[in-house]
Amino acid sequence: MSLAARAGRALGGRRAFISEAAASRAATLLDAAPDRPDVFARVCARRLEAASPADRKALEAALSELGNDAPVVERAIASGAPLDAVAILAAAWDSLDPDAKALVRDPLSRRDPGPVTWSRVTATQVNQTTCGAATMAMMLMMGDPLVALWVASGRRGGPYLPPEVFEADVRGGAIHTVADRWDSLQLAIHDRVTRHGLGLVPWPQAYGTPPWRVNNLTRFAGLRFRGVLVDDARADEVAALAAHARAALADGIPVPLYASGDSARGLDSVVPRHVVLLVGVDGDAFLAYEPSSGALHRLDLGALGGTPAAALGNWNRVAWAVLPKVRDR
């Protein structure tokens, strides 16, 4: 059991995510997923319904015009971007080169184990403290094509800049290539999550990303998120985590996980140490984006606690997960 989970149990007992009601709801959502529009489609539909007739007509035309790439527009609408920025993205789509289109279409670039690469750039974390920022940046690009567009090409949706891109621009420095923009986005997110990490007091950047900041600063399809402590030595908690993760992924929502180690490696190893992102299901296991390698790895939650796992950045425990709040799904 991780020290964090032990402390959480002492303070709060059993957590809500492993309750029978929560597990049942996750199972119901997973069963319904094949016949239910995903989170992007649902949020997009709500925004279109609320739009003016003229805006709705323009956006429906953009969705139709992009054909098989219509999900890019759908995700942009669901991101909360101004509708004119979405229209600019749609109008510019045909002028993008194939590499830029591929990155915007699918920032992961694959759905099997292996490196995540864009134009010969591997999507690794920029330094040893930005695993959380890299994970948040990857999730952000999966949910917001306008962020992915900027990383891919430096282009913007007209005068609109997603807040994370604005902060990356404000940081300054040489931002000329895909690698430059990917690194700058991570650093901007790292600045953001540590700025008020302890209320009014900054969190020391050398300590990485505090888990509670991933909860409240993750921006994805207008959802809100909650952090949950995980005791991966308990089979019921691992099963509950897997059920919630499968339900979220079936809805198009990635799941950040904090990895840790055993107390035998020292007290500093048992607190959350590294952040990865569950991005898909692979049979009985999951696919995780691991930022130190910049690759997707297979992760079997049922095998935690043994040999260090590449999917966890060579840690062997899971201590914390970030899940979408039920009422917003």
PLM region descriptions:
Residues 70-74, 147-152, 160-163, 225-230:
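Short, surface-exposed acidic
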Residues 85, 127, 132-136, 210-214, ...:
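Stable alpha-helical elements in mature extracytoplasmic
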Residues 6-42, 46, 90-197:
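Active-site nucleophile-adjacent alpha helix/oxyanion-hole segment immediately C-terminal to the catalytic cysteine
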Residues 23-24, 29-77:
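Eukaryotic low-complexity, mixed-charge intrinsically disordered interaction/regulatory segments enriched
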